[in-house]
């Protein structure tokens, strides 16, 4: 059965429902103009519209947040001289990353690179156009003006992130990641070999790594 993916513009929740079902955000109950279609999915989420789908999203969010927290905790432990504790925080963070990946894959959220770039761009767009704009207004209303400015500052960063993802997506679609219309300086990300041309070599002549390791050199110093 085909399903449709939606984004709640009020709380940021994404969810899927069988095609033809009236969308209602399972988290905040928003409907109508507050719900945005993200993309149609060819039955890649067998849990669409169920409580289990909500539970999977909750589990994914919890594991993702735990991973970040443990990474921050590791930095504190390292600064305080607890190398072993720092390493264990990082090890556990990697465990949590894999747990989150399990639930993310169950939800059918992993696509190919072009699909992932589009999903990333849409997520960044929501953050800078809706989420941070709204939370900044609330912070101002409640007197937290410094925090409101931080929200707006991060929103500008998210805008740049969206632009970057869309530029990369255009390159992928145009098959212009490793070939350009103009002569470029290419650098091997593995060994640092430099070459000049409109196209990156199929393999690095120095370390034999494949073309996928090449990028346009962008030194700015």
Q: What residue spans do the PLM features occupy?
A:
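Non-heme di-metal
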Residues: 2-221
């Amino acid at each position: 059965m085909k399903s449709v993916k939606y984004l709640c513009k009020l709380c940021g929740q994404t969810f899927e429902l069988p095609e033809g079902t009236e969308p209602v955000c399972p988290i905040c109950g928003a409907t109508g103009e507050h719900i945005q279609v993200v993309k149609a999915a060819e039955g890649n989420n067998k849990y669409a519209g169920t409580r289990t789908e909500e539970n999977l999203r909750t589990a994914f969010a919890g594991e993702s947040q735990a991973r970040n927290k443990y990474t921050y905790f590791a930095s504190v432990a390292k600064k305080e001289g607890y190398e072993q504790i720092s390493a264990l925080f990082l090890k556990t963070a990697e465990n949590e990353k894999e747990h989150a990946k399990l639930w993310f894959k169950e939800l059918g959220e992993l696509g190919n690179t072009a699909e992932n770039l589009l999903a990333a761009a849409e997520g960044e767009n929501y953050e800078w156009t809706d989420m941070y704009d709204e939370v900044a207004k609330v912070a101002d209303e409640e007197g937290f003006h410094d925090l409101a400015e931080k929200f707006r500052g991060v929103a500008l960063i998210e805008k740049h992130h969206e632009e970057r993802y869309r530029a990369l997506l255009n390159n992928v679609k145009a098959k212009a990641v490793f070939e350009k219309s103009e002569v470029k300086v290419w650098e091997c990300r593995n060994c640092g070999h430099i070459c000049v041309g409109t196209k990156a070599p199929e393999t690095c002549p120095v370390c034999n790594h494949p073309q996928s390791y090449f990028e346009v050199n962008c030194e700015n110093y």
